[in-house]
């Protein structure tokens, strides 16, 4: 299903995962027994050797193609001498094959604009391995070679001993990178979560001892056994004729054969839990505390009938209402948890279970357990109200309406993911036309009695369960015992609960619109397709109507000011003023009431203080622009002060700050900022527990009011699917009536500057044998569009070199790289950062290799081939971005805050083509100044 009912989260963030058991009486209705159709947009076929294929012609984006090779084989199929080799096989797909020598594949794909990691990628899970290859569809020779790549991945990997042994170092670095509190706690949890099944012993990353010592034949055996046509699918979605795609599939895959005496592809069973048990898992470096209650697993298979689809809608509505109640609890003045969810969730493709989880705040595990279990019991015993059901129906219907509106503007990658799920999980793919029709016909007929019966049938009562507490082991912090966790659940299940009390709320954001202003000036920019308006209160507007999407309008506005206008004593009140105000609601609406009023609306608005700017941003569906504008107006109309919600917000911030302190990265990050900026108090560091008392509610409200009681000097930009003639009266009403009293609209340069010279620091933090090298180069810059491009070209080419040398040649890292930026505000300067995770024993080698590549770039410049790879990728990305509302909005907004010419959006390709090797070399000499940088190295605790 295009929307995957159980995963819809974009508008209300209210859905649970998974599907549900048959609703009572559904099987007796002949119409509901009818099978779901297959979307007419996709051609599904199967070759004689068993290989499945999916073909969907789609022109969003134009001239692009999304290819997937999907293999129903993952770590669950590994033999005892193969732990981690499913994932290792995935790595070897990029290290030599029948038609591409080692490293030749990545180099070739980069040459046609495919970026390694960002575009070209793969993943290995328990039950599948998936290879992702997006590319330009403009040249037929590239298409044929792309299918040749898929062919080699499927059955053409060379897997020679030398290449396998060389890849061990990279895999071990990936293993090292994943180590930490989460990994240590997971190893304790997995046997319990999967109830002793094979899944607990088959984590895709594998085991270090096996990865170091396995024999290459073990890896070749895995590839031979499981990479076979009857376990594979090829997915082709994009700007290609279906007949051409099918021809390419048959040419490259028809000749493949399944192995003789093939091993059966079985699926591991997860035994149901019969007795309740509890587990307390702590770690010194854990970054948060939480509870999980997992009820017995249920075998599951998607029912691909209209009745099955209706049952999924019932579950979606039920999950939305139950989790809406949990969200309400999280926003109480003294919440029992920071956030919680309760739903049927997929554990594996063939199993699901009822899960209750909560992230803990200051109230502790007992209060969280009591609250979530009681809320489940309340729903099971008393069900829901008609108003709750009506709200969640509105939201669901609006979500499907927007998806249907965008049916010809849906990205190919979305369809590719849908067809992957069809192959791997049996998910239905009726197409959005059919889905929207079913939802429109079925949802109105789903009544409260049916929902409440589903709740009684679905929410477990006293079943055998696993209760888990996870969190940091901190001195002075009491921890629960397993017995206490079980006792808390039992007590909550037995406690008397009453029906949910539903409070009436207003039906609209505003009783009546404000007295409108007017439009006093209008100009047209034909070159960029812009209309510029000046309203009667001085507010300016830029309109860019597009046809890139059918149901999307984006908005932003910015002016100078922000946190820079406030003194050091107010810095934390200023930093958190916007989020504090948002946490208390909007004008007269509490956050809970606002969510209810906005049910069925696709609109959101935020107002915030950046370091040097005031920012207003919003998004809406085409029919909800007025709602978005009403929210903008209310943002300027006053602040809702709520001491209880403020204390709830501050409590959550304190918990987050405390938990952050236990993580090795916290000390590392703080040291980097302090070292780079010479301990300047206004440097952009993370919040610490000792900073919390410096936040004052009334001062934060006052700061917000100072900046958002006036719309002076704001220019609002609108990009998307709107009619300028229809939107102008709304702009005059809601933006033209905003107050514009005089306020400061210039930023203040606080004098935050990086240190000069070479400064080196070492940080010792963390239990694992892992290190991180960080280099930061800074300095003044002459900021122009061309100079920013030269800097970006340099960093992207350096990343190619870092992967080629530090990863592939030397095996010192798994990931990491370089990034750079320039800005004119508050002063013209550049920043280039390099981050390279590695092992303590390799720190000196990494530094030596990194500086060798820097020196090579400074003295020799880049290889022309590498520069061409970057430019080709940029030009392809640019052509795609030109068809995106978000890109136009970003360019127009940057032109206002940075003072640049928005017309450069039309000359980007010419500017890119003009960049030469000498330009990049000069950029390296200018921006990689080896006499002016900060080096901070994170090593383990001594």
Where do the model's predicted regions map?
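Hydrophobic, small-residue-rich alpha-helical packing segments that form membrane-like cores
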Residues: 155, 163-177, 181-231, 235-237, ...
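Peptidyl-prolyl cis-trans isomerase
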Residues: 108, 156-159, 163-164, 446-450, ...
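M16 family metallopeptidases and their MPP-like homologs
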Residues: 54-56, 61-88, 103-152, 183-209, ...
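Flexible, low-complexity linker/tail segments at the boundary of structured domains
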Residues: 227, 708-709
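Proteolytic maturation boundary segments
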Residues: 24-55, 241-308, 312-313, 319, ...
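Conserved, carboxylate-rich catalytic/transport cores that coordinate ions
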Residues: 223, 606, 704
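Bacterial N-terminal signal peptides that target proteins for export
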Residues: 1-10
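Bacterial N-terminal signal peptides
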Residues: 9-19
């Amino acid at each position: 299903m295009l929307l995957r009912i159980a995963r819809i989260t974009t508008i209300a963030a209210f859905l649970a995962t998974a599907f549900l058991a048959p609703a009572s009486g559904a099987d007796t209705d002949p119409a509901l027994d009818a099978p779901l159709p297959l979307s007419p947009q996709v051609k599904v076929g199967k070759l004689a050797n068993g290989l499945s294929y999916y073909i969907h012609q789609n022109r969003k984006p134009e001239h692009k193609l999304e290819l997937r090779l999907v293999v129903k084989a993952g770590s669950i199929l590994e033999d005892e001498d193969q732990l981690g080799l499913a994932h290792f096989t995935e790595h070897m797909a990029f290290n030599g094959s029948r038609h591409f020598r080692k490293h030749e594949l990545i180099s070739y794909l980069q040459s046609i604009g495919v970026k390694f990691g960002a575009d070209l990628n793969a993943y290995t899970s328990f039950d599948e391995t998936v290879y992702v290859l997006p590319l330009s569809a403009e040249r037929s020779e590239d298409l044929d070679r792309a299918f040749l790549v898929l062919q080699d991945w499927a059955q053409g990997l060379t897997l020679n001993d030398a290449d396998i042994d060389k890849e061990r170092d990279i895999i071990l670095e990936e293993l090292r990178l994943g180590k930490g509190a989460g990994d240590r706690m997971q190893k304790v949890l997995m046997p319990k979560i999967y109830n002793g099944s094979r899944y607990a012993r088959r984590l895709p990353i594998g085991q270090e001892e096996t990865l170091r010592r396995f024999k290459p034949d073990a890896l070749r055996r895995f590839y031979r056994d499981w990479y076979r046509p009857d376990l594979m699918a090829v997915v082709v979605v994009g700007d290609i004729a279906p007949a051409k795609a099918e021809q390419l599939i048959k040419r490259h895959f028809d000749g493949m054969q399944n192995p003789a005496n093939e091993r059966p592809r079985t699926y591991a069973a997860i035994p149901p839990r019969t007795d309740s048990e509890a587990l307390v898992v702590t770690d010194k470096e854990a970054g948060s505390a939480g509870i999980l209650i997992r009820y017995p697993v249920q075998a599951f298979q998607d029912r691909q009938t209209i009745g099955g689809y209706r049952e999924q809608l019932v579950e979606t509505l039920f999950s939305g209402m139950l989790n809406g109640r949990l969200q309400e609890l999280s926003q109480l003045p003294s919440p029992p948890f920071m956030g919680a969810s309760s739903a049927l969730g997929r554990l594996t493709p063939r199993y699901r279970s009822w899960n209750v989880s909560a992230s803990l705040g200051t109230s502790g595990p007992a209060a969280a357990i009591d609250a979530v279990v009681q809320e489940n019991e309340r729903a099971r015993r008393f069900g829901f109200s008609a108003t709750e059901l009506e709200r969640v129906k509105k939201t669901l219907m609006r979500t499907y309406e927007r998806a249907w509106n965008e049916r010809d503007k849906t990205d190919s990658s979305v369809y590719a993911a849908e067809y992957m799920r069809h192959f791997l999980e049996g998910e239905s793919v009726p197409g959005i036309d059919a889905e929207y029709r079913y939802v429109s016909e079925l949802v109105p007929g789903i009544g409260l009695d049916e929902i409440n019966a589903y709740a009684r049938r679905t929410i477990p009562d006293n079943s055998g369960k696993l209760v888990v507490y996870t969190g940091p082991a901190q001195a002075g912090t009491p921890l629960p015992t397993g017995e206490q966790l079980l006792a808390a659940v039992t007590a909550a299940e037995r406690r008397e609960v009453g029906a949910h009390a539903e409070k009436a709320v207003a039906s609209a954001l505003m009783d009546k619109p404000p007295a409108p202003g007017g439009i006093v000036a209008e100009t047209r920019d034909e070159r960029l397709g812009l209309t510029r308006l000046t309203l009667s209160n001085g507010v300016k507007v830029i309109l860019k109507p597009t046809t890139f999407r059918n149901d999307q309008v984006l908005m932003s506005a910015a002016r100078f000011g922000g946190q820079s206008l406030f003194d050091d004593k107010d810095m934390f009140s200023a930093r958190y003023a916007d989020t504090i105000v948002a946490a208390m609601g909007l004008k007269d609406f509490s956050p809970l009431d606002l969510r209810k009023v906005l049910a069925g609306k696709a609109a959101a608005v935020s107002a915030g203080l950046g370091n040097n700017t005031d920012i207003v941003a919003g998004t809406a569906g085409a029919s909800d622009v007025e709602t978005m504008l009403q929210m903008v107006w209310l943002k300027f109309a006053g602040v809702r002060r709520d001491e209880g919600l403020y204390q709830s917000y501050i409590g959550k911030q304190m918990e987050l700050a405390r938990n952050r302190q236990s993580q090795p990265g916290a000390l590392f990050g703080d040291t980097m900022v302090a070292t780079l900026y010479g301990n300047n108090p206004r440097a952009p560091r993370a919040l610490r527990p000792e900073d919390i008392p410096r936040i004052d509610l009334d001062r934060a409200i006052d700061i917000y009011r100072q900046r958002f009681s006036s719309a002076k000097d704001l220019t609002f930009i609108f990009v998307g699917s709107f009619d300028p003639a229809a939107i102008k009266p709304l702009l005059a009403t809601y933006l033209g009536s905003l107050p514009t009293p005089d306020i400061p609209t210039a930023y203040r340069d606080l004098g935050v500057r990086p240190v000069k010279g070479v400064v080196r620091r070492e940080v010792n933090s963390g239990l694992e044998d892992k290190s991180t090298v960080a280099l930061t180069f800074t300095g003044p810059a002459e900021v122009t569009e061309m100079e920013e491009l030269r800097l970006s070209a340099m960093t992207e080419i350096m990343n190619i070199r870092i992967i080629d040398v530090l990863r592939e040649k030397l095996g010192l890292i798994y990931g990491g790289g370089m990034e750079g930026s320039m800005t004119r505000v508050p002063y013209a300067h550049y920043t280039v950062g390099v981050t390279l995770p590695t092992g303590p024993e390799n720190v000196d080698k990494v530094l030596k290799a990194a500086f060798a590549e820097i020196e090579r770039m400074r003295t020799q410049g880049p290889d022309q081939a590498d520069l061409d790879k970057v430019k080709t990728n940029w030009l392809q990305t640019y052509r795609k971005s030109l068809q995106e509302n978000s890109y136009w909005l970003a360019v127009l907004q940057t032109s206002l805050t940075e003072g640049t010419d928005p017309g450069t959006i039309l000359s980007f390709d010419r500017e890119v083509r003009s960049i030469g090797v000498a330009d990049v070399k000069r950029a390296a000499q200018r921006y990689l100044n080896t006499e002016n940088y900060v080096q901070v190295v994170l090593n383990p605790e001594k």
